[in-house]
């Protein structure tokens, strides 16, 4: 079906949409980082025993798997098909990653993974991921993906993605101007 499973942005048009299993949610809200508004995707993950290390805590590398799943599911919830994206000869590769571990998750914990786009333009898309357990922030991650073709050449992201995931730039500009003392008080 190409790059899109359904009409782009259809789900994002709703204030909050809950998918059938009540575990995946997406909606437009104030940016958790405080800059304007954006689409925030949330999913729940139960920590499996195989995801833990010798101390029964989630091995640090497994958070990357949670983030990957969250990014793919966010695309799906927004009406985009990553498999179709790859069939068109495009793919996303991680070019930059910054993680801060604030606490440890353990076997059988129920975690909420929150994902949103903080910037999207040209060939890059920047995601913010946060993991919390019952409101306690455990992990923060800023992740930059670049769009390339099968030969590794840089390619622009689909316009539909940019339009769908771009943070509310007007609101972001206003927020920045206010912090710089240039906006209305």
Region annotations inferred by a language model:
Residues 47, 57-58, 93-94, 120, ...:
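Hydrophobic aliphatic residue packing
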Residues 42-48, 100:
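Generic structural detector for well-ordered beta-strands
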Residues 45, 95-97, 142:
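Short, well-ordered beta-strand segments in beta-rich or mixed alpha/beta enzyme
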Residues 52-102:
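N-terminal first-folded block
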Residues 2-43, 76, 106-110, 118-185:
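HotDog/MaoC-like acyl-thioester-processing domains
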């Amino acid at each position: 079906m190409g790059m899109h499973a359904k009409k782009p942005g259809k789900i994002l048009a709703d204030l909050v949409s809950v998918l059938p299993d009540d575990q995946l949610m997406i909606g437009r809200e104030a940016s958790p980082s405080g800059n304007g508004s954006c689409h925030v995707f949330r999913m729940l993950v139960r920590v499996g025993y195989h995801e833990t290390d010798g101390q029964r805590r989630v091995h640090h590398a497994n958070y990357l798997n949670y983030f990957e799943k969250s990014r793919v599911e966010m695309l799906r919830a927004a009406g985009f098909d990553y498999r179709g994206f790859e069939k068109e000869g495009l793919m996303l590769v991680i070019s930059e990653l910054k993680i801060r571990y604030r606490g440890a998750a353990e076997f059988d914990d129920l975690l909420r993974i929150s994902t949103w786009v903080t910037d999207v333009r040209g060939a890059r898309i920047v995601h913010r991921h946060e993991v919390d357990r019952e409101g306690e922030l455990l992990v923060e991650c800023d992740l930059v993906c670049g769009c390339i073709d099968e030969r590794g050449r840089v390619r622009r992201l689909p316009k539909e993605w940019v339009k769908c995931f771009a943070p509310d730039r007007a609101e972001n500009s206003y927020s920045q101007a206010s912090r710089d003392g240039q906006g209305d008080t």
